[in-house]
């Protein structure tokens, strides 16, 4: 599409919005920008790209949407916004950053450039990072972008300006980005899993699933579908005329299946009946990370990358901050930071990765989720649960039949202190909130920092007490 002299309204001034402003401005569009926040981030940066008189802060007004050719919408702005819906009904196109990226890639990328696309409720960032490391280990130049690291358009502009094109683009994509994407043609794409999330944006989980399914182009495209065969909603996304590879923690029977094979006392990552590497050789903990590794392997094999460097990369992959990250161990108790667990599915996966008794710290803003899936793993894996935040009571009600002690606290410091008192030698204290953080913290990273500081405080007191006793 030729954007020269087109009047385009960009909604949202976050990282993605700024990337769209930069891309559209260099394409010659007449750009205006709006954000519902009165003092949005990046305002000073934005004023260096477009004239101040084209920047509007505060509630959206109807006049902003008049006489425009298109709306470029940030993931944080809902398409259900009434003024956006009114514009759609008048024939105004609504696009997002990934749609702009896909169109541009068709125009600029050299032949043979590969694309792997990743979405899901949980594990997206881990799998995208894994795939990037695995593909780099084969000698390829790889760009990992999208809902991770650089915005896709920022990464694209850097590559255009340097003239150095990657062999492979690895794109982590959110459901919000996929809502406005129709031109992306990945060589292979995966939906890792689906659990209740973002139900503050979607009326029902089926709407959320439909947005995720947009990662797969029409059935006549050559995209390989990588599907979680143990998630019914994901498996139902299979196109009759497309090639599929599946992954899961069950034993694989055929060459198009990746899974876990038991052998004696060991568990192996496998393709079909071929054992690839022991699960215990992964540097990341938990069976959910074994599933992540299998999804990453399936994606890489879909574009014929060789096994040996892929497996070596998996062997040394250390994981990501705030995702089942071990932060301390003292008095026989291990503390794990899984603050990135912002939905129920993620917390369930974290708990199911433990064999030892766990003291679970959970709670926050549940975003309308159903917490009942926590009941079984809480019953099976926890010695106690410590709850805080806005939806602590809802979680407490959901797990009341578990016959596990539940403690309500007001602060993270108190949560850590109570957890340490509940824990016995050999136990783990796990922060896996199953909720968003904004009711009490700036973001999930801030929540993790407060947790880590509290753990360090307890550890310091424990060491001082031990020294005094000696």
UniProtKB/Swiss-Prot annotation:
One of its GO terms (cellular component) is cytoplasm. Pfam families: Mur_ligase_C (PF02875), Mur_ligase_M (PF08245), MurD-like_N (PF21799). The keyword DNA damage does not apply. InterPro entries: Mur-like_cat_sf (IPR036565), Mur_ligase_C (IPR004101), Mur_ligase_C_dom_sf (IPR036615), Mur_ligase_cen (IPR013221), MurD (IPR005762). GO terms for biological process: cell division; cell wall organization; peptidoglycan biosynthetic process; regulation of cell shape. ATP binds at residues 120-126. Its main location: cytoplasm. Pathway: Cell wall biogenesis; peptidoglycan biosynthesis. It catalyses: UDP-N-acetyl-alpha-D-muramoyl-L-alanine + D-glutamate + ATP = UDP-N-acetyl-alpha-D-muramoyl-L-alanyl-D-glutamate + ADP + phosphate + H(+). Keywords: ATP-binding, Cell cycle, Cell division, Cell shape, Cell wall biogenesis/degradation, Cytoplasm, Ligase, Nucleotide-binding, Peptidoglycan synthesis. Its EC number is 6.3.2.9. HAMAP family: MurD. Belongs to the MurCDEF family. NCBIfam families: murD. Cell wall formation. Catalyzes the addition of glutamate to the nucleotide precursor UDP-N-acetylmuramoyl-L-alanine (UMA). This is UDP-N-acetylmuramoylalanine--D-glutamate ligase. It comes from Nitrosomonas eutropha (strain DSM 101675 / C91 / Nm57).
